[in-house]
């Protein structure tokens, strides 16, 4: 009874692996990437450039663009893009159009993102959430919709970099909210453009050492948030809460942040070059072994574990 089942599972796994390894022929197709100043975007731009793709890399800052151009080949071109600015998006789209011409755009990688304030939700304002959503959710949506005609022209691919925290909201602030939103947009888009030959993949990295996870920046941002709180709210939590919270955050980040960004880049490259790209990729050991399994557990259990890990406010009622 069990032997046929086991053989069936092994056969399915073998066929899946064979299918997953099938690649498209080598290509010099055009790939547009956002957020190439540093981190995942910069690494991917350089790796695709080395593989012969014609990379159109957008950066937020002139220094980021100049630094990338300096170490890349002549095939790679850079432009400036602020994904929160509709006018900047329109200018970038025109720039892309002049490069791709009749060939269209084969790949769009929405990588630009920010962390915002990572901390208790009651400390934050609507504007705090808005700033993160503008970059992490509305930005990719705006860029994707603007470039969609060029992607349809080439029967191309959209790869949205979300986060494993788009599957499990482990902390307060706009980051998790923004990534959940981008996940939903990606799922809807995938179904809507599939009839036209456009493929959509989601890459949900675990914790990696990038500017988004820079501890000094995260701590400075949270301390500034604490400093602006009304005295009544500060009294509710107590002075010791912030110190303990930052200590826990530091311990977790030092323990699980992976310095090997190539794990993410390999997933992005597979999504662009595989004949059958996956719907979702989850690079990082913490994504596979911690966050994704936890996302399927009962909410009460996850809440209890997080309550045990994080410090309690001074005036807690339990």
Swiss-Prot record:
Active site as annotated: 175
Positions on the Lumenal side per record topology: 24-288
Binding site for NADP(+): 32-56
Transmembrane segments: 1-23, 289-309
Protein location: Endoplasmic reticulum membrane; Microsome membrane
Pfam families: adh_short (PF00106)
Primary location recorded for the protein, binned into one broad class: endoplasmic reticulum
Positions contributing to substrate binding: 163
Domain notes: The last 8 amino acids of the C-terminal tail are important for a proper localization as well as for the in vivo enzymatic activity.
Name assigned to this protein: Retinol dehydrogenase 5
């Amino acid at each position: 009874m069990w032997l046929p089942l086991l053989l069936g599972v092994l056969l399915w796994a073998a066929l899946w692996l064979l299918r997953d390894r099938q690649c498209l022929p080598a290509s010099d197709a055009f790939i547009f990437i956002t957020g190439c100043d540093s981190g995942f975007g910069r690494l991917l731009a350089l790796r695709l450039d080395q593989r012969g793709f014609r990379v159109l890399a957008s950066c937020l800052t002139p220094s980021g663009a100049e630094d990338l151009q300096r170490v890349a080949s002549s095939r790679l071109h850079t432009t400036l893009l602020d994904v929160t600015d509709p006018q900047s998006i329109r200018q970038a789209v025109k720039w892309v159009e002049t490069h791709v011409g009749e060939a269209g755009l084969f790949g769009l990688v929405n990588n630009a993102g920010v962390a915002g304030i990572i901390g208790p939700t009651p400390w934050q304002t609507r504007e705090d959430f808005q700033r993160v959503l503008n970059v992490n959710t509305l930005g990719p949506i705006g860029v994707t919709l603007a470039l969609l005609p060029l992607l349809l022209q080439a029967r191309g691919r959209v790869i949205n970099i979300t986060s494993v925290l788009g599957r499990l909201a482990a902390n307060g602030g706009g980051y998790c909210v923004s990534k959940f939103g981008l996940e939903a947009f990606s799922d809807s888009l995938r179904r809507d453009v599939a009839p036209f030959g456009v493929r959509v993949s989601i890459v949900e990295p675990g914790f990696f050492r990038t500017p988004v996870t820079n501890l000094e920046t995260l701590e400075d941002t949270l301390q500034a948030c604490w400093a602006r709180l009304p005295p009544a709210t500060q009294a509710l939590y107590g002075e010791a809460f912030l110190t303990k919270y930052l200590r826990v955050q530091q311990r977790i980040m030092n323990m699980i942040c992976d310095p090997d960004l190539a794990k993410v880049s390999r997933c992005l490259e597979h999504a662009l070059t595989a004949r059958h790209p996956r719907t979702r990729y989850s690079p990082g050991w913490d994504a596979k072994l911690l966050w994704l399994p936890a996302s399927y557990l009962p909410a009460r259990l996850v809440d209890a574990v997080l309550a045990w890990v994080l410090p309690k406010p001074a005036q807690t009622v339990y």
